[in-house]
Amino acid sequence: MSLKQLPTESMPREKLLQRGPQSLSDAELLAIFLRTGTQGMNVLALADLLLRDFGSLRALFCASKEQFCRHKGLGEAKFVQLQAVLEMTQRYLAETLKRGDALTSPQQTKLYLSSVLRDRQREAFYILFLDNQHRVIRDEILFEGTIDAASVYPREVVKRALHHNAAAVILAHNHPSGVAEPSQADRRITDRLRDALGLVEIRVLDHFVVGDGEVVSFAERGWI
């Protein structure tokens, strides 16, 4: 069936305008992004096929250029367009976080940290440097690789915190395995960093561990 044969209210763009983006399926949202189908396949059918081939929107978004462009109907221009959309989304989340108080919006903080860290193939140790009103001054990835007591250096963390004149920090790292449950090593390095930063009167407000679909907060567990 051609897309033009669908009732007007069932066309993705019209449906979005009438009912809002939340009313659309993943395939319908993707169809709006793709705009056109291929010969013999309308854009909704193409979107549905791509989601079945990749398995999910997330897998599609994480695909390399080679993986993306090998599918009929997708090319370099669409890949560039998708990367721009993803980067704008991440910058929107970062801007939202930096304009507010990180601690009064824990869910926004988790969402932002997940967007930054979740899909990394290697562990990355990330820090939000905060002022005395808990507003974000700067955010940095300080260490990459296996995160344990031997690879995260408290001296470097203290050095960066002093450089930014931070009054407090929020720590975060990802688990590429997808399991967000903190390890004993995670708890030990958190204690070491809290002790080191405490010597210069900089507070560790929280440590988030980012997994696949879950973000664990040390503060919510009562560990900080």
Swiss-Prot record:
Chain spans, region Disordered: 1-20
Tell me if Disulfide bond is a UniProt keyword of this record: no
Residues annotated as binding Zn(2+): H173, H175, D186
Q: Entry's Pfam families?
A: RadC, UPF0758_N
Domain named MPN is located at 102-224
GO terms (BP aspect): proteolysis
Q: Which InterPro entries match?
A: MPN, RadC_JAB, RuvA_2-like, UPF0758, UPF0758_CS, UPF0758_N
Record-level Gene Ontology MF annotations: metal ion binding; metallopeptidase activity
- Record keywords: Hydrolase, Metal-binding, Metalloprotease, Protease, Zinc
Cited CDD domains: MPN_DUF2466
Motif JAMM motif: which residue numbers? 173-186
Q: Which family does it belong to?
A: Belongs to the UPF0758 family.
Q: What is this protein identified as? A: UPF0758 protein VC_0217
